[in-house]
Amino acid sequence: MRRRLGRWIIVAVLAGAGCDDTVDGPGPVLPPPPPPGGAPPLAATVTVPPNYGIHDTFVRDGIAILCVWNTGIMILDVGGGGRGGTPTSPVTISTFAPSNGSLASPAIHNAWWFRNPSGVKRYLFLGQEGPATLGASSSGDVKVLDLSNLAQPTEVAFYRVVGAGAHNFWMNEQAQVLYAAFYNGGVVALDVSGSLAGDLAAREIARVQPGGSDSTFVWGVMLAGGRLYASDMLSGFWQLNPQTLQPIGGGQNVPERFGSDLWVRGEYAYTGTWGNREGTRGDAVKIWHLNGSGAPSLVDSIIVDGINTVSDIEVSDNGRLLVFSAEGQSDAGLYIYRLTDPEKPTRIGYANVVQGIHTVSLGRVGTKLYAFAARNPSNPALLIYDLSSLDTP
């Protein structure tokens, strides 16, 4: 079965009831969930050009870097850029459109602002997401910008996998290694130490298709506790060797849905689901326990009626909150759960956004936690939610 991804996304929409969270999986039947929490305060809305809109946002040290597709990137001061910006009143520092590379447009999807072991934040890694067909092909490069001057980014390097396209990144910043999900190309590890320029092909450390050549379409990767994990849309949730990238656990464990994003925290991991797989919607967050060696085993699932896709997922830096974005149908938006029991998250907040939230990133400005959410593609905007009232012991 093939689905179009990238700039042209086709998602089958099924009829659904109203919002009704349940937890579905091994163990006894749970009692009905408590009444869901209300919407967190909306601190600010930053509209972006309707040039296919906004995708990921990377937040670090009071700077928010927006991936604004064919507009390129927008760099915002939200509390650390020296321009007087705050989460309630962001200030634009610069906008920059990288070259098209192997695509017909910039198509900037995701970013990672690299802080090296010396604390220098020079390089910004960008992923292009070009047209793709689930289970068959994808396109788009990794771009590298020099952000020595936030007001004047410059493009300095790139990395390309012929016949495959970049999606999401993670970094081992101490080891100076970039891990990149490349859809049908699998997972790539790149040495990004020292100065970067031109074609980075010679810096490739390893590459793997965890599900094999016929069952690999990797959405994202994450390094946690010295262990590397990958969420594959076709072949499930994997544990990989961080040095060789060879699979060492998991895989072939989400047969009924297409996989999406992932987040790992301590002994638990959470993965999203996407679209429609033979009549089953992407309305689930999978809950995994990681054993002593790090291998995942499924313990439960959050099922959210009234959505088609869980497109982005993150746990707060203190482990208190699980936050995810949802698209499709009547109950799209932003979902917030408390992780008092990591195996049984409890919903405490929800913001309905009918257009859908495509991605969400958590960032702390001062002591307050915020969610930076991408409303996309209609009326595209960055929505900044104040989660401080929910971020309590």
Give residue ranges: language-model regions:
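Bacterial N-terminal signal peptides that target proteins for export
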Residues: 1-9
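C-terminal motif of bacterial Sec signal peptides marking the signal peptidase cleavage site
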Residues: 15-18
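Feature marking well-ordered beta-strand scaffolds used for ligand recognition
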Residues: 20-393
